[in-house]
């Protein structure tokens, strides 16, 4: 239990450090890194064939519903399929012991990721870059992306170039040589 808590804290610190570095970096500096996405419990809603405006509105509604019924534990995120970016899950992390029809447990997984600064409309370009990198390095993706919203409209308003998102491509196996 204590080790799991320390691992979670380490992963959160890694995200915060990356966020601070990205604030200081130029918008074009989007290095691909290996990382471990920690296990968590989430309140989830599916979406299908949704455009960006629909996804934004529904994610906001999902967040409000989660806040009304559960104690929130971390940053909002979406999970979309590699072959269909307009379908997937809205995920609001909640306390580990949460229970309910829309609660799902997500296991820890290795990934390659980019801490991206910019507009949400450009996610498909970042997704393609991660897929190309995985293919080039002989990595096997799980088949979905996880977009973790670190800073967005509540922090930066309409300044889309200042939004910060960790865009992750979970990988089935990353060789020790690829870990940085």
PLM features per residue range, with description:
Residues 4-180:
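A solvent-exposed interaction/effector surface
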